[in-house]
Amino acid sequence: EDDTLYQAQVNKVDYILKKLHLEEGMSLLDIGCGWGFLLIEAARKYKIHGTGITLSHEQYAEFQKRIKDQGLEDYLTVELMDYRDLPKSGYQFDRVVSVGMLEHVGRDNYQLFLDCVEKILKPGGLFLLHFISALKEHPGDPWVKKYIFPGGTVPSLREILNHMAEDNF
């Protein structure tokens, strides 16, 4: 309640990392890794081997700098990659996380996104998907679609659960 916005973000990442049940040496993929905070925390606290993917050249460059500045080159990598290219990458991960990225995928691509995750998740692996949800399926507010999630939408929990069932998540 009295936390700063920064502390609330730190708390959210800590909570997500606990939910992933990470163990030293595990592999973790962050789809839409942003500036790398989640993976940096995971590497520091759990000694995992993490990969982040992003479409942003600015985030890619800054995350690479942070990896080097914090001496985490043996633990972390970041790639400029679209999630749709993951299946042909040959990668396999113990854990996959995506925080606040699904909204940008767009309703027509939810199943493709989940199919891509299913193909790179090791048997017995764990996938944590964090997204903003709506109560019902709807096309969305034009302003939000233009300025917040261009090309995307806010999904309902029901539609994501239905898509997840297709991949046995």
Question: How should each PLM-predicted stretch be described?
Answer:
Residues 1-19, 23:
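Conserved Class I S-adenosyl-L-methionine-dependent methyltransferase catalytic core
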Residues 25-34:
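Conserved class I S-adenosyl-L-methionine
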Residues 35-46:
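Conserved SAM-binding loop of SAM-dependent methyltransferases across substrates and taxa
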Residues 71-83:
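Conserved SAM-binding strand-loop segment of SAM-dependent methyltransferases
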Residues 84-96:
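A short acidic, Gly/Pro-enriched loop at the edge of an enzyme's catalytic core
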Residues 111-124:
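A short glycine-rich, Lys/Arg-flanked "PGG" loop and its adjoining helix->strand segment in the class I
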Residues 124-132:
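Conserved beta-strand signature within the Rossmann-like core of class I S-adenosyl-L-methionine
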Residues 133-151:
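Short, glycine-/aromatic-enriched active-site segment of Class I SAM-dependent methyltransferases
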